[in-house]
Amino acid sequence: MSNTPIELKGSSFTLSVVHLHDAHPEVIRKALEEKIAQAPAFLKNAPVVVNVAGLDGSINWQQLHQTFIDSGLHLVGISGCQDDALKAEISRAGLALLTEGKASAPRAAKPAETPAPPAAALRTRLIDLPVRSGQRIYAPGADLVVTSHVSAGAELIADGNIHVYGTMRGRALAGAGGDKEAQIFSTNLAAELVSIAGVYWLSDQIPAEFYNKAARLRLADGALTVQPLN
């Protein structure tokens, strides 16, 4: 046991970032409520960062903060602010200023090392039954394969890929451990939310031409992409 009552340690977390393009509280509140209604289990009471790089003009920071509280979200801080006077306003309002990480400087090449032995093959968790609303299935360190339908309100999580050979109506979160090479495959994509390594789409962000169709999702340049599943 430590002899001190607290310890400060560095850590990192994946947070959703809300990019604002309108400063009116009622407009923001309505938009937030619509998003939360689409995926309440994922967004309700979620911690979020607000990026204000797309806003012009004055902002009532206290009202903005209250808008997020009223919507059931926890505002961690503000990002995307480059103006010193604006930063001072944000600080006076009692809000934290966050700075996005910058790419690290190139490092000198290290001498070649002995190759590590190949990693063990990724395991697979197989689910042969329908996944019903309220169920949550997690495949740690493995792919997840579901050979039946997934109901709205159900949640699939895998550190590897997710395959659904049926209608996918719930939430599918692949690459949950941070694997950006993970993919999602569905023979009928109708999901409430899809996510790969923390990058997600809500249902209204899935391109209409792929909704209720066989589709494959993956990351390209850090963004979600979708293509037909042939």
Curated annotation (Swiss-Prot):
This is Probable septum site-determining protein MinC. Keywords: Cell cycle, Cell division, Septation. It comes from Cronobacter sakazakii (strain ATCC BAA-894). Interacts with MinD and FtsZ. Cell division inhibitor that blocks the formation of polar Z ring septums. Rapidly oscillates between the poles of the cell to destabilize FtsZ filaments that have formed before they mature into polar Z rings. Prevents FtsZ polymerization. Pfam families: MinC_C (PF03775), MinC_N (PF05209). Belongs to the MinC family. InterPro entries: CAP/MinC_C, MinC, MinC_C_sf, MinC_N, Septum_form_inhib_MinC_C. Transmembrane segments: none annotated. GO terms for biological process: cell morphogenesis; division septum assembly; regulation of cell division; regulation of cell septum assembly. SUPFAM superfamilies: Cell-division inhibitor MinC, C-terminal domain.
